[in-house]
Amino acid sequence: MRRDGNEGMSTIPGFNQIQFEGFCRFIDQGLTEELYKFPKIEDTDQEIEFQLFVETYQLVEPLIKERDAVYESLTYSSEVYVPAGLIWKPGRDMQEQTIFIGNIPLMNSLGTSIVNGIYRIVINQILQSPGIYYRSESDHNGISVYTGTIISDWGGRSELEIDRKARIWARVSRKQKISILVPSSAMGSNLREILDNVCYPEIFLSFLNDKEKKKIGSKENAILEFYQQFACVGGDPVFSESLCKELQKKFFQQRCELGRIGRRNMNRRLNLDIPQNNTFLLPRDVLAAADHLIGMKFGMGTLDDMNHLKNKRIRSVADLLQDQFGLALIRLENVVRGTICGAIKHKLIPTPQNLVTSTPLTTTYESFFGLHPLSQVLDRTNPLTQMVHGRKLSYLGPGGLTGRTASFRIRDIHSSHYGRICPIDTSEGINVGLIGSLAIYARIGHWGSLESPFYEISDRSKEVQMLYLSPSRDEYYMVAAGNSLALNQSIPEEQVVPARYRQEFLTIAWEQVHFRSIFPFQYFSIGASLIPFIEHNDANRALMSSNMQRQAVPLSQSEKCIVGTGLERQAALDSGVSTIAEHEGKIIYTDTDKIILLGNGDTLSIPLVMYQRSNKNTCMYQKPQVRRGKFIKKGQIVADGAATVGGELALGKNVLVAYMPWEGYNSEDAVLISERLVYGDIYTSFHIRKYEIQTHVTSQGPERITNEIPHLEAHLLRNLDRNGIVMLGSWVETGDILVGKLTPQMAKESSYAPEDRLLRAILGIQVSTSKETCLKLPIGGRGRVIDVRWIQKKGGSSYNPETICVYISQKREIKVGDKVAGRHGNKGIISKILPRQDMPYLQDGTPIDMVFNPLGVPSRMNVGQIFECSLGLAGDLLDRHYRIAPFDERYEQEASRKLVFSELYKASKQTANPWVFEPEYPGKSRIFDGRTGDPFEQPVLIGKSYILKLIHQVDDKIHGRSSGHYALVTQQPLRGRAKQGGQRVGEMEVWALEGFGVAHILQEMLTYKSDHIRARQEVLGTTIVGGTIPSPEDAPESFRLLVRELRSLALELNHFLVSEKNFQINRKEA
């Protein structure tokens, strides 16, 4: 239990705070802990000793800025310097130097690291906490078998098991089990000590026969017996030092190292008082665990819930970085040890600087950030995405679960998740329930547990105090649910509230409550907290909405929502995309690149981001929000980022929608839109694509960048400058050359003319030709060149490879095939774009912008969109914005409906439009068909909804193929858009064509267009020359492949053709 200094009102913590705290903990504590573990290293003769002086290590500020590291594809890291000493023991002389041991990537203001110019983020992992856990399972006879599982800090598991005869076994594998006395004796306890330290010695003596006594007669015998069972070796192994080392390395180190958290858990579960610094499993632990298991057998004690959060721990960024630093120091130790021995062998005088290399630390962190499953490329589709990414919790990764082996129970919601892990926000698909998201108030405690804040209700003190409770503490208190608090604030004694106690939900009197929730959003993640009226939605649809908000594309003209939850400003602020003034002063100059501020007599330049590409090809930019001559204060927002307006998150647009069918164009989640959304650039977004090419040194010489490319048409080279690189500002189309490159190669002898061969023979000249290997713009890449980068890597080789990156901006309007979605899981594909005069229109003549299918609401039970739609219309007419916290029914029944209807009534009176609120069908209105001018038969629900345009766009998905590559084995077209693949006609598609009797089309698809090699060639020739296309006679290649596979199984398969003339069988080879 941790008490917070804040009293009364609570403030929402920074959304990136968990990442920052973890990295600071690594820098302040983790580095020191690992450096203290670095041993003193001696040579074989013990004449020289090398050691590190940890107290004064230094981290140097990076020489480059974050923006330059991204631009030049470098790592934003800090150099680590540690004082080291080399002591010559005979004379006790010491040479001390401050040595450079490597680089550690730093965390930036977004909570991410920049490695090789790429933003990467480290995900928090949930693991089973080390300690002991008791479970009960039924065997095949239906009898309960009690087991105790000891989990080490490494994740290794050992099991204790008690059978029907009350004999206790230690299970070292699935098949092998051994008496509990053997491992206890192998760990150093004799029989007398074992019997003195257990509560039930008679049970231990009951299964101690002569054979067992011989096994534990001495420590050596016990070790041999344990090794024989563990390693499953036959014969009679001989006790030796190497055998002990092998057992120590393979078993005890992996399964008996508890760690700091494991020791604490073991002491609390078994009521032990072993010191915290003793992190290894002791015989006393094993015997106490066996005693507890015997008590379980006879009905004493409680079983453990493995899925309770008190039995889990969070492996944060601090733990992961500390583990990698320790691994790097082990590698450094081996390097130093080898270098010292080499220096002594060659009679050289070593110095601390010569003994240490920076390679182990630098390469360890590079491989960690590049290859580790928990280090991921930061998703920067929009500001919400990059902020939510760092708050993910994963059961996957090293030491964790896999998507295919995790059970339903692990994936399910647990009562201990309340206020810690969001019950809504998780991934869809195979990883559902395995990748979650932190609740907005949750934080990671000192022992790796998730803590959530609550208000303490005390009769002694009238002051409200906020406490952070761990999962192991809050189940002992009555915690009132925050979504259904006091109905009558003045008389708390008369209230009956739902509460949570020991994983059960009860209804109790108010005076029995110990704690209450602090905020209705407390149990949700950021994505779920941005959904208005979430309490009226089905949880599955809320999950879809949380995920789809992260897929929203920043639009060219952002607009904040009319109906929100109040969390939009905090989300935009913590995302880091807005620029905030660090000093107060007067604005003296603004443009798209910078803002110049005059304050305290100094001039400060604030750089802005302009046309920066995210890894999802969206455009990140900043817009100045202050004018020249204005005075600003410290902390004021001076520039908005992409998808923010006025410091609030703005992912979509408020558009006029109607829920009605329209000629079938909005059936099955299709959406009908007005052309106003296209021509008015309502849903226009900018996307930046990156194309790169490298130059290499081949065996025939280096590749050249040039604008003189032979055998290419001039119009393809029109945009190249004199260096052979496309010019800034050029408009490029598909197939244009972006970078001209020639690769040298030797021509074949047969390709030379006879006179060329004669000259070469006389003069001895080696004539080489070059092959054109230019960077060409692929299909769908047309746009404007906005940036070109020529990067040369620094290296020690004689020739350093160069990388040329070309960035092309595309302007994309909304079109048929694009995906749009609301904030309630209501998603759809644009099916038709109607002229605005043909769209249905309101009674004041305003045409509708989008038409949704009304059948998509009842079955999906996401009624929140109806409340948002109607309240948005009222807000648009009244020029008002609403910020509504969820679960407003805790104030009164039907609070949401009353709010919406009252605002519609106000809008109707204020605008003198009675159709806005008609009592017969509130929220609905009579609208007219734009094509005929006639009113529709039924009133239609209309309103303003906040609709997002998602990253799933038709330009990235549509694909066609006329010719392309074929698979080598099956000779069928390749699969996928990236490989210019074809569309597969599968088994069910063939059935459909067979059902319509289209024999010729079916034959074309299975032969000419697929894997009949000869027929493909004949079709090409016939198309060029003219004439009828011959029918394929023999079998296609896939059938021939099947025949060959059957032959490899010794099954001969042939087909025979019977002649029509003489009925003779003509055998043909398949």
From Swiss-Prot:
Coiled coil: none annotated. Its main location: plastid. GO terms for molecular function: DNA binding; DNA-directed RNA polymerase activity; ribonucleoside binding. One of its GO terms (cellular component) is chloroplast. SUPFAM superfamilies: beta and beta-prime subunits of DNA dependent RNA-polymerase. It is an enzyme of class 2 (transferase). It catalyses: RNA(n) + a ribonucleoside 5'-triphosphate = RNA(n+1) + diphosphate. Gene3D superfamilies: 2.40.50.100, 2.40.50.150, 3.90.1100.10, DNA-directed RNA polymerase, beta subunit, external 1 domain (2.30.150.10), DNA-directed RNA polymerase, subunit 2, domain 6 (2.40.270.10), RNA polymerase alpha subunit dimerisation domain (3.90.1800.10), RNA polymerase Rpb2, domain 2 (3.90.1110.10). It is found in: Plastid, Chloroplast. In plastids the minimal PEP RNA polymerase catalytic core is composed of four subunits: alpha, beta, beta', and beta''. When a (nuclear-encoded) sigma factor is associated with the core the holoenzyme is formed, which can initiate transcription. PANTHER family: DNA-DIRECTED RNA POLYMERASE I SUBUNIT 2 (PTHR20856). This is DNA-directed RNA polymerase subunit beta. The lineage of its organism: Eukaryota, Viridiplantae, Streptophyta, Embryophyta, Tracheophyta. The gene is rpoB.
